Design a protein with these regions (language model features):
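Transmembrane alpha-helical segments in integral membrane proteins
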Residues: 105-128, 205-209, 384-408, 440-451
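Individual transmembrane alpha-helix segments
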Residues: 84-112, 374-394, 398, 408-415
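Alpha-helical transmembrane segments of helical membrane proteins, especially in multi-pass transport
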Residues: 241-250, 392, 429-448
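Transmembrane helical segments that form the transport core of multi-pass membrane transport proteins
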Residues: 346-405
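Hydrophobic alpha-helical membrane segments
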Residues: 1-351
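C-terminal transmembrane helix pair
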Residues: 28, 435-485
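Juxtamembrane boundary at the C-terminal end of a transmembrane helix
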Residues: 485-501
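Membrane-interfacial helix-loop-helix connectors in multipass membrane proteins
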Residues: 171-195, 257-269, 356-364, 413-427, ...
Length: 501
Protein backbone atom coordinates (compact mmCIF):
# COMPACT_ATOMS: atom_id res chain seq x y z
CA UNK A 1 0.00 0.00 0.00
CA UNK A 2 1.31 3.43 -0.94
CA UNK A 3 1.61 6.07 1.82
CA UNK A 4 -1.16 8.20 0.29
CA UNK A 5 -3.50 5.20 0.23
CA UNK A 6 -2.60 4.36 3.84
CA UNK A 7 -3.44 7.91 4.90
CA UNK A 8 -6.78 7.80 3.09
CA UNK A 9 -7.58 4.45 4.68
CA UNK A 10 -6.74 5.78 8.14
CA UNK A 11 -9.01 8.78 7.67
CA UNK A 12 -11.80 6.54 6.37
CA UNK A 13 -11.58 4.32 9.45
CA UNK A 14 -11.59 7.31 11.79
CA UNK A 15 -14.84 8.50 10.24
CA UNK A 16 -16.50 5.49 11.90
CA UNK A 17 -14.96 6.12 15.31
CA UNK A 18 -16.85 3.75 17.61
CA UNK A 19 -15.01 0.68 16.33
CA UNK A 20 -11.47 1.94 16.88
CA UNK A 21 -11.36 4.98 19.19
CA UNK A 22 -12.63 3.21 22.36
CA UNK A 23 -9.27 1.44 22.74
CA UNK A 24 -7.43 4.74 22.30
CA UNK A 25 -9.56 6.15 25.08
CA UNK A 26 -7.70 3.60 27.21
CA UNK A 27 -4.62 5.85 27.08
CA UNK A 28 -5.73 8.17 29.92
CA UNK A 29 -7.00 5.10 31.76
CA UNK A 30 -3.41 3.86 32.15
CA UNK A 31 -2.58 6.69 34.55
CA UNK A 32 -5.81 6.07 36.48
CA UNK A 33 -4.87 2.40 36.98
CA UNK A 34 -1.36 3.33 38.13
CA UNK A 35 -2.74 6.02 40.45
CA UNK A 36 -4.95 3.34 41.99
CA UNK A 37 -1.85 1.34 42.91
CA UNK A 38 -0.26 4.44 44.45
CA UNK A 39 -3.47 5.24 46.33
CA UNK A 40 -3.50 1.71 47.71
CA UNK A 41 0.10 2.06 48.89
CA UNK A 42 -0.66 5.35 50.61
CA UNK A 43 -3.72 3.79 52.28
CA UNK A 44 -1.64 0.87 53.60
CA UNK A 45 1.00 3.23 54.99
CA UNK A 46 -1.64 5.42 56.65
CA UNK A 47 -3.35 2.40 58.21
CA UNK A 48 -0.01 1.24 59.63
CA UNK A 49 0.71 4.70 61.06
CA UNK A 50 -2.77 4.83 62.57
CA UNK A 51 -2.59 1.32 64.05
CA UNK A 52 0.79 2.05 65.68
CA UNK A 53 -0.34 5.48 67.01
CA UNK A 54 2.40 7.13 64.95
CA UNK A 55 -0.18 9.13 63.04
CA UNK A 56 -1.50 10.55 66.30
CA UNK A 57 2.04 11.56 67.29
CA UNK A 58 2.58 13.30 63.95
CA UNK A 59 -0.68 15.23 64.26
CA UNK A 60 0.16 16.26 67.82
CA UNK A 61 3.62 17.44 66.77
CA UNK A 62 2.20 19.42 63.86
CA UNK A 63 -0.36 21.17 66.05
CA UNK A 64 0.43 24.84 66.37
CA UNK A 65 3.10 24.80 63.67
CA UNK A 66 2.96 26.89 60.52
CA UNK A 67 2.00 24.34 57.85
CA UNK A 68 1.35 26.85 55.07
CA UNK A 69 4.47 26.93 52.85
CA UNK A 70 5.97 30.31 51.92
CA UNK A 71 4.75 31.90 48.66
CA UNK A 72 6.63 30.86 45.50
CA UNK A 73 8.40 34.23 45.26
CA UNK A 74 9.77 34.01 48.82
CA UNK A 75 13.55 33.75 49.37
CA UNK A 76 15.09 30.28 49.43
CA UNK A 77 15.94 30.74 53.10
CA UNK A 78 12.25 30.98 53.92
CA UNK A 79 11.61 27.55 52.40
CA UNK A 80 14.59 26.09 54.27
CA UNK A 81 13.32 27.46 57.58
CA UNK A 82 9.80 26.20 56.92
CA UNK A 83 11.06 22.70 56.01
CA UNK A 84 13.31 22.62 59.08
CA UNK A 85 10.36 23.48 61.32
CA UNK A 86 8.21 20.70 59.84
CA UNK A 87 10.81 17.91 59.58
CA UNK A 88 10.99 16.95 63.30
CA UNK A 89 7.24 16.43 63.43
CA UNK A 90 7.44 13.92 60.58
CA UNK A 91 10.13 11.74 62.17
CA UNK A 92 7.61 9.06 63.35
CA UNK A 93 6.78 8.43 59.68
CA UNK A 94 10.36 7.42 58.86
CA UNK A 95 10.14 3.72 59.72
CA UNK A 96 11.35 0.59 57.91
CA UNK A 97 7.75 -0.52 57.39
CA UNK A 98 6.77 2.74 55.68
CA UNK A 99 9.93 2.58 53.57
CA UNK A 100 9.12 -1.00 52.59
CA UNK A 101 5.57 -0.03 51.65
CA UNK A 102 6.91 2.88 49.57
CA UNK A 103 9.38 0.67 47.69
CA UNK A 104 6.75 -2.03 47.12
CA UNK A 105 4.29 0.59 45.87
CA UNK A 106 6.81 2.01 43.39
CA UNK A 107 7.72 -1.45 42.10
CA UNK A 108 4.06 -2.46 41.81
CA UNK A 109 3.25 0.78 39.98
CA UNK A 110 6.07 0.18 37.48
CA UNK A 111 4.99 -3.42 36.85
CA UNK A 112 1.32 -2.48 36.50
CA UNK A 113 2.20 0.41 34.19
CA UNK A 114 4.25 -1.87 31.91
CA UNK A 115 1.58 -4.58 31.86
CA UNK A 116 -1.28 -2.19 31.15
CA UNK A 117 0.62 -0.30 28.44
CA UNK A 118 1.45 -3.55 26.66
CA UNK A 119 -2.16 -4.76 26.89
CA UNK A 120 -3.44 -1.42 25.58
CA UNK A 121 -0.95 -1.52 22.69
CA UNK A 122 -2.13 -5.02 21.76
CA UNK A 123 -5.76 -3.87 21.82
CA UNK A 124 -5.07 -0.74 19.78
CA UNK A 125 -3.08 -2.40 17.01
CA UNK A 126 -5.54 -5.30 16.86
CA UNK A 127 -8.41 -2.84 16.43
CA UNK A 128 -6.50 -1.03 13.67
CA UNK A 129 -5.77 -4.25 11.79
CA UNK A 130 -9.35 -5.45 12.23
CA UNK A 131 -10.85 -2.24 10.85
CA UNK A 132 -8.37 -2.14 7.96
CA UNK A 133 -9.61 -5.62 7.06
CA UNK A 134 -13.16 -4.21 7.17
CA UNK A 135 -13.97 -6.28 10.25
CA UNK A 136 -15.22 -5.33 13.71
CA UNK A 137 -12.42 -3.46 15.41
CA UNK A 138 -13.56 -3.83 19.01
CA UNK A 139 -13.98 -7.58 18.68
CA UNK A 140 -10.47 -7.83 17.24
CA UNK A 141 -9.17 -5.60 20.05
CA UNK A 142 -10.63 -7.71 22.85
CA UNK A 143 -9.33 -10.94 21.33
CA UNK A 144 -5.98 -9.40 20.47
CA UNK A 145 -5.07 -8.56 24.06
CA UNK A 146 -4.72 -12.19 25.10
CA UNK A 147 -3.31 -13.30 21.76
CA UNK A 148 -0.53 -10.72 21.32
CA UNK A 149 0.18 -9.46 24.84
CA UNK A 150 3.19 -11.68 25.51
CA UNK A 151 4.89 -11.10 22.16
CA UNK A 152 4.47 -7.32 22.35
CA UNK A 153 5.88 -7.37 25.89
CA UNK A 154 8.96 -9.24 24.65
CA UNK A 155 9.35 -6.76 21.79
CA UNK A 156 9.32 -3.88 24.27
CA UNK A 157 11.79 -5.65 26.57
CA UNK A 158 14.13 -6.27 23.63
CA UNK A 159 13.98 -2.61 22.58
CA UNK A 160 14.63 -1.38 26.12
CA UNK A 161 17.56 -3.81 26.41
CA UNK A 162 19.09 -2.51 23.17
CA UNK A 163 18.68 1.08 24.34
CA UNK A 164 20.18 0.28 27.76
CA UNK A 165 23.19 -1.55 26.34
CA UNK A 166 23.80 1.19 23.78
CA UNK A 167 23.59 4.03 26.31
CA UNK A 168 25.71 2.28 28.95
CA UNK A 169 28.36 1.29 26.39
CA UNK A 170 28.50 4.80 24.94
CA UNK A 171 28.75 6.46 28.36
CA UNK A 172 31.45 4.05 29.52
CA UNK A 173 33.46 4.52 26.32
CA UNK A 174 33.26 8.31 26.51
CA UNK A 175 34.14 8.29 30.23
CA UNK A 176 37.24 6.16 29.67
CA UNK A 177 38.31 8.28 26.70
CA UNK A 178 37.90 11.54 28.64
CA UNK A 179 39.87 10.13 31.57
CA UNK A 180 42.68 9.35 29.13
CA UNK A 181 42.71 13.07 28.35
CA UNK A 182 43.96 14.96 25.36
CA UNK A 183 42.57 14.99 21.87
CA UNK A 184 41.85 11.26 22.00
CA UNK A 185 39.03 11.78 24.49
CA UNK A 186 37.49 14.56 22.45
CA UNK A 187 37.77 12.55 19.22
CA UNK A 188 36.20 9.45 20.77
CA UNK A 189 33.33 11.52 22.15
CA UNK A 190 32.70 13.12 18.77
CA UNK A 191 32.53 9.67 17.16
CA UNK A 192 30.74 7.66 19.86
CA UNK A 193 27.89 10.05 20.70
CA UNK A 194 26.54 10.37 17.12
CA UNK A 195 27.07 6.63 16.56
CA UNK A 196 25.09 5.73 19.69
CA UNK A 197 22.36 8.19 18.71
CA UNK A 198 22.17 6.54 15.30
CA UNK A 199 21.82 3.10 16.88
CA UNK A 200 19.00 4.33 19.14
CA UNK A 201 17.14 5.95 16.24
CA UNK A 202 17.58 2.83 14.09
CA UNK A 203 16.23 0.64 16.89
CA UNK A 204 13.19 2.92 17.31
CA UNK A 205 12.61 2.90 13.55
CA UNK A 206 12.63 -0.90 13.42
CA UNK A 207 10.58 -1.52 16.55
CA UNK A 208 7.94 1.01 15.48
CA UNK A 209 6.86 -1.57 12.90
CA UNK A 210 7.82 -4.70 14.86
CA UNK A 211 4.79 -4.46 17.16
CA UNK A 212 2.62 -4.12 14.05
CA UNK A 213 4.27 -7.20 12.55
CA UNK A 214 3.38 -9.19 15.68
CA UNK A 215 -0.32 -8.43 15.11
CA UNK A 216 -0.49 -8.54 11.31
CA UNK A 217 1.61 -11.70 10.90
CA UNK A 218 0.50 -13.31 14.20
CA UNK A 219 4.11 -14.25 15.02
CA UNK A 220 6.62 -14.07 17.83
CA UNK A 221 9.47 -11.63 18.37
CA UNK A 222 12.05 -13.18 16.06
CA UNK A 223 9.73 -13.51 13.07
CA UNK A 224 8.34 -10.03 13.72
CA UNK A 225 11.82 -8.48 13.62
CA UNK A 226 12.66 -10.36 10.42
CA UNK A 227 9.35 -9.32 8.87
CA UNK A 228 9.99 -5.69 9.79
CA UNK A 229 13.49 -5.68 8.30
CA UNK A 230 12.11 -7.22 5.11
CA UNK A 231 9.35 -4.60 4.93
CA UNK A 232 11.82 -1.72 5.36
CA UNK A 233 14.18 -3.22 2.76
CA UNK A 234 11.41 -3.75 0.19
CA UNK A 235 9.46 -0.54 0.95
CA UNK A 236 12.01 2.06 2.13
CA UNK A 237 9.97 4.97 0.76
CA UNK A 238 6.86 3.85 2.65
CA UNK A 239 8.82 3.40 5.87
CA UNK A 240 10.48 6.81 5.54
CA UNK A 241 7.10 8.41 4.78
CA UNK A 242 5.73 7.03 8.05
CA UNK A 243 8.78 8.20 10.00
CA UNK A 244 8.35 11.70 8.60
CA UNK A 245 4.63 11.66 9.38
CA UNK A 246 5.29 10.46 12.93
CA UNK A 247 7.97 13.10 13.44
CA UNK A 248 5.61 15.81 12.21
CA UNK A 249 2.93 14.55 14.59
CA UNK A 250 5.25 14.45 17.61
CA UNK A 251 6.90 17.79 16.87
CA UNK A 252 3.55 19.39 16.10
CA UNK A 253 2.00 18.19 19.36
CA UNK A 254 5.09 19.30 21.29
CA UNK A 255 5.02 22.76 19.74
CA UNK A 256 1.31 23.06 20.45
CA UNK A 257 1.91 21.95 24.04
CA UNK A 258 4.54 24.66 24.51
CA UNK A 259 2.25 27.29 23.00
CA UNK A 260 -0.75 26.29 25.10
CA UNK A 261 1.41 26.08 28.22
CA UNK A 262 2.05 29.79 27.70
CA UNK A 263 -1.42 30.98 26.71
CA UNK A 264 -3.44 28.28 28.54
CA UNK A 265 -5.41 25.20 27.53
CA UNK A 266 -2.56 22.65 27.61
CA UNK A 267 -4.89 19.66 28.35
CA UNK A 268 -6.24 20.06 24.80
CA UNK A 269 -2.96 18.54 23.58
CA UNK A 270 -3.64 15.38 25.57
CA UNK A 271 -7.10 15.01 24.03
CA UNK A 272 -5.79 15.64 20.52
CA UNK A 273 -3.04 13.09 21.09
CA UNK A 274 -5.11 10.12 22.24
CA UNK A 275 -8.24 10.89 20.21
CA UNK A 276 -6.66 11.59 16.82
CA UNK A 277 -2.87 11.63 16.41
CA UNK A 278 -2.14 8.25 18.02
CA UNK A 279 -4.91 6.29 16.22
CA UNK A 280 -4.12 8.02 12.92
CA UNK A 281 -0.42 7.11 13.08
CA UNK A 282 -1.17 3.52 14.15
CA UNK A 283 -3.67 3.09 11.32
CA UNK A 284 -1.16 4.45 8.79
CA UNK A 285 1.69 2.14 9.82
CA UNK A 286 -0.65 -0.84 10.12
CA UNK A 287 -1.98 -0.07 6.64
CA UNK A 288 1.55 0.18 5.24
CA UNK A 289 2.74 -3.08 6.77
CA UNK A 290 -0.57 -4.88 6.19
CA UNK A 291 -0.54 -3.72 2.58
CA UNK A 292 2.94 -5.17 2.19
CA UNK A 293 1.63 -8.47 3.54
CA UNK A 294 -1.60 -8.30 1.53
CA UNK A 295 -3.83 -8.66 4.59
CA UNK A 296 -5.79 -5.40 4.46
CA UNK A 297 -8.85 -4.33 2.49
CA UNK A 298 -9.81 -0.95 3.99
CA UNK A 299 -13.45 0.11 4.28
CA UNK A 300 -14.74 2.86 2.04
CA UNK A 301 -15.18 6.33 3.48
CA UNK A 302 -18.82 7.22 4.29
CA UNK A 303 -20.64 9.44 1.82
CA UNK A 304 -22.26 11.64 4.46
CA UNK A 305 -20.75 15.08 5.03
CA UNK A 306 -18.40 15.47 8.00
CA UNK A 307 -20.51 18.18 9.67
CA UNK A 308 -23.64 16.03 9.39
CA UNK A 309 -21.82 13.00 10.85
CA UNK A 310 -20.46 15.12 13.68
CA UNK A 311 -23.91 16.43 14.58
CA UNK A 312 -25.43 12.96 14.38
CA UNK A 313 -22.64 11.58 16.56
CA UNK A 314 -23.12 14.22 19.25
CA UNK A 315 -26.87 13.55 19.33
CA UNK A 316 -26.26 9.82 19.56
CA UNK A 317 -23.80 10.38 22.39
CA UNK A 318 -26.36 12.37 24.37
CA UNK A 319 -29.01 9.68 23.81
CA UNK A 320 -26.66 6.88 24.88
CA UNK A 321 -25.67 8.78 28.02
CA UNK A 322 -29.31 9.27 29.02
CA UNK A 323 -30.09 5.63 28.23
CA UNK A 324 -27.19 4.42 30.36
CA UNK A 325 -28.31 6.52 33.32
CA UNK A 326 -31.83 5.09 33.05
CA UNK A 327 -30.80 1.46 32.75
CA UNK A 328 -28.25 1.42 35.59
CA UNK A 329 -29.66 3.50 38.48
CA UNK A 330 -28.10 1.16 41.06
CA UNK A 331 -24.60 1.78 39.71
CA UNK A 332 -25.15 5.52 39.72
CA UNK A 333 -26.34 5.34 43.30
CA UNK A 334 -23.21 3.38 44.24
CA UNK A 335 -20.97 5.83 42.36
CA UNK A 336 -22.62 8.79 44.09
CA UNK A 337 -22.19 7.09 47.47
CA UNK A 338 -18.47 6.52 46.82
CA UNK A 339 -18.00 10.15 45.76
CA UNK A 340 -19.91 11.38 48.81
CA UNK A 341 -17.97 9.02 51.07
CA UNK A 342 -14.73 10.42 49.68
CA UNK A 343 -15.99 13.92 50.41
CA UNK A 344 -16.75 13.00 54.02
CA UNK A 345 -13.32 11.35 54.35
CA UNK A 346 -11.60 14.40 52.91
CA UNK A 347 -13.51 16.74 55.23
CA UNK A 348 -12.67 14.60 58.26
CA UNK A 349 -9.00 14.06 57.37
CA UNK A 350 -8.44 17.79 56.79
CA UNK A 351 -9.88 18.65 60.21
CA UNK A 352 -6.59 18.64 62.16
CA UNK A 353 -5.04 21.01 59.61
CA UNK A 354 -8.00 23.32 59.02
CA UNK A 355 -6.57 26.08 61.22
CA UNK A 356 -2.99 25.75 59.95
CA UNK A 357 -3.60 25.32 56.21
CA UNK A 358 -6.01 27.38 54.17
CA UNK A 359 -7.14 27.48 50.56
CA UNK A 360 -8.78 30.37 48.79
CA UNK A 361 -11.06 30.24 45.77
CA UNK A 362 -10.53 33.98 45.36
CA UNK A 363 -6.78 33.41 45.16
CA UNK A 364 -7.17 30.64 42.60
CA UNK A 365 -9.34 32.92 40.46
CA UNK A 366 -7.00 35.91 40.68
CA UNK A 367 -5.50 35.30 37.23
CA UNK A 368 -8.62 33.74 35.72
CA UNK A 369 -8.91 34.12 31.93
CA UNK A 370 -12.30 32.82 30.72
CA UNK A 371 -11.40 31.51 27.24
CA UNK A 372 -8.29 29.52 28.13
CA UNK A 373 -9.82 28.43 31.44
CA UNK A 374 -12.86 27.05 29.61
CA UNK A 375 -10.67 25.06 27.23
CA UNK A 376 -8.60 23.75 30.13
CA UNK A 377 -11.63 22.77 32.22
CA UNK A 378 -13.36 21.00 29.32
CA UNK A 379 -10.32 19.04 28.14
CA UNK A 380 -9.09 18.15 31.62
CA UNK A 381 -12.47 17.10 33.01
CA UNK A 382 -13.31 14.99 29.97
CA UNK A 383 -9.89 13.30 30.05
CA UNK A 384 -10.46 12.47 33.72
CA UNK A 385 -13.92 11.11 32.91
CA UNK A 386 -12.56 8.96 30.08
CA UNK A 387 -9.74 7.61 32.24
CA UNK A 388 -11.99 6.80 35.18
CA UNK A 389 -14.57 5.10 32.95
CA UNK A 390 -12.26 2.86 30.95
CA UNK A 391 -9.94 2.30 33.89
CA UNK A 392 -12.90 0.44 35.35
CA UNK A 393 -12.15 -2.43 32.98
CA UNK A 394 -9.66 -3.60 35.63
CA UNK A 395 -12.37 -5.14 37.82
CA UNK A 396 -13.94 -1.70 38.47
CA UNK A 397 -11.35 -0.88 41.15
CA UNK A 398 -9.74 2.14 39.39
CA UNK A 399 -13.17 3.66 38.73
CA UNK A 400 -14.11 3.36 42.40
CA UNK A 401 -10.70 4.71 43.42
CA UNK A 402 -11.05 7.71 41.09
CA UNK A 403 -14.46 8.54 42.57
CA UNK A 404 -13.11 8.23 46.10
CA UNK A 405 -10.04 10.40 45.40
CA UNK A 406 -12.14 13.08 43.69
CA UNK A 407 -14.43 13.12 46.69
CA UNK A 408 -11.49 13.42 49.08
CA UNK A 409 -10.09 16.37 47.13
CA UNK A 410 -13.45 18.12 47.19
CA UNK A 411 -13.79 17.47 50.92
CA UNK A 412 -10.32 18.82 51.70
CA UNK A 413 -10.92 21.98 49.69
CA UNK A 414 -14.28 22.50 51.37
CA UNK A 415 -12.81 22.08 54.89
CA UNK A 416 -9.79 24.35 54.34
CA UNK A 417 -11.51 27.10 52.31
CA UNK A 418 -11.16 30.59 53.80
CA UNK A 419 -14.56 31.69 52.45
CA UNK A 420 -16.87 28.63 52.32
CA UNK A 421 -19.88 30.61 51.10
CA UNK A 422 -17.86 32.03 48.21
CA UNK A 423 -16.62 28.53 47.30
CA UNK A 424 -20.19 27.22 47.32
CA UNK A 425 -21.36 30.11 45.15
CA UNK A 426 -18.55 29.42 42.67
CA UNK A 427 -19.14 25.67 42.45
CA UNK A 428 -22.94 25.72 42.28
CA UNK A 429 -23.61 26.82 38.64
CA UNK A 430 -21.22 24.41 36.92
CA UNK A 431 -21.29 21.82 39.68
CA UNK A 432 -24.90 20.89 38.93
CA UNK A 433 -23.59 19.60 35.57
CA UNK A 434 -20.03 18.56 36.40
CA UNK A 435 -20.67 16.49 39.53
CA UNK A 436 -23.41 14.35 37.93
CA UNK A 437 -21.09 13.83 34.94
CA UNK A 438 -18.39 12.57 37.31
CA UNK A 439 -20.91 10.19 38.87
CA UNK A 440 -22.00 8.89 35.44
CA UNK A 441 -18.37 8.38 34.40
CA UNK A 442 -17.69 6.46 37.60
CA UNK A 443 -20.83 4.36 37.15
CA UNK A 444 -19.74 3.58 33.60
CA UNK A 445 -16.40 2.39 34.96
CA UNK A 446 -18.13 0.16 37.51
CA UNK A 447 -20.34 -1.23 34.74
CA UNK A 448 -17.37 -1.97 32.47
CA UNK A 449 -15.61 -3.73 35.33
CA UNK A 450 -18.57 -6.08 35.77
CA UNK A 451 -18.82 -6.66 32.00
CA UNK A 452 -15.08 -7.33 31.72
CA UNK A 453 -15.25 -9.89 34.53
CA UNK A 454 -18.22 -11.67 32.97
CA UNK A 455 -16.53 -11.61 29.58
CA UNK A 456 -13.37 -13.15 31.01
CA UNK A 457 -15.23 -15.83 32.98
CA UNK A 458 -17.63 -16.62 30.13
CA UNK A 459 -15.09 -16.14 27.32
CA UNK A 460 -17.52 -13.74 25.61
CA UNK A 461 -15.36 -11.20 23.79
CA UNK A 462 -18.24 -9.93 21.64
CA UNK A 463 -20.23 -8.80 24.70
CA UNK A 464 -17.29 -6.74 25.97
CA UNK A 465 -16.66 -5.35 22.49
CA UNK A 466 -20.26 -4.20 22.23
CA UNK A 467 -20.12 -2.53 25.66
CA UNK A 468 -16.91 -0.72 24.67
CA UNK A 469 -18.67 0.68 21.61
CA UNK A 470 -21.59 1.79 23.76
CA UNK A 471 -19.23 3.28 26.36
CA UNK A 472 -17.61 5.36 23.62
CA UNK A 473 -20.92 7.03 22.82
CA UNK A 474 -21.74 7.56 26.50
CA UNK A 475 -18.40 9.36 26.86
CA UNK A 476 -19.22 11.49 23.82
CA UNK A 477 -22.45 12.50 25.56
CA UNK A 478 -20.56 13.25 28.77
CA UNK A 479 -18.16 15.35 26.70
CA UNK A 480 -21.06 17.53 25.60
CA UNK A 481 -22.17 17.98 29.22
CA UNK A 482 -18.64 18.77 30.40
CA UNK A 483 -18.10 21.32 27.63
CA UNK A 484 -21.27 23.13 28.72
CA UNK A 485 -20.12 22.90 32.35
CA UNK A 486 -16.71 24.30 31.37
CA UNK A 487 -18.32 27.26 29.60
CA UNK A 488 -20.36 28.00 32.72
CA UNK A 489 -17.27 27.56 34.94
CA UNK A 490 -15.19 29.80 32.74
CA UNK A 491 -17.65 32.60 32.01
CA UNK A 492 -20.33 32.52 34.72
CA UNK A 493 -19.20 30.87 37.97
CA UNK A 494 -16.34 33.28 38.82
CA UNK A 495 -18.41 36.45 38.34
CA UNK A 496 -22.16 36.17 38.95
CA UNK A 497 -22.04 36.12 42.76
CA UNK A 498 -19.62 39.02 43.30
CA UNK A 499 -22.29 41.73 43.64
CA UNK A 500 -23.92 39.71 46.42
CA UNK A 501 -20.90 38.47 48.45
Amino acid sequence: MEPAAAIRSALAVLQRPDDVLPVYFLTPAVSVVVQTVVTGGVAVAMLYLWATSRLERVLAALAGRELQPPPPDAPAEAFDEWAASIAPALEPVATPVVALVAVATVLAAVVVFAAVVVAVTAAQLSACHGRLRDRRGMTAAVRGVGRFWTSILLVRVLEVAIWAVTVVTALATVAVALLAGGLVGVFVSIVVVPAATGVLLAARAVFAFTVVAVVVDDVGVGDAVRGTLEFIAVNPAAAVAYYVLAAVGVVGLSALAVLLAIVGGAPLVTVLGFAFVAPFLDLVKTGLYGGHRGTVSPPAAPDERLVARLGRGLRRGCREAVTFVRRAPHLHGLAAAILLGGGVLGWWSAGPFADAVSTSIAGRLADHEPVTATATFAANNWTVAVGASLGGLVLAVPAASALLVNGVVLGVYARTEEAPLELLAFVLPHGILELPAIVVAGALGLHLGVVAWRSWVGNDSEALAEELRRAFWVLVGLGVVLVVAAIVEGFVSPYYYRPFL
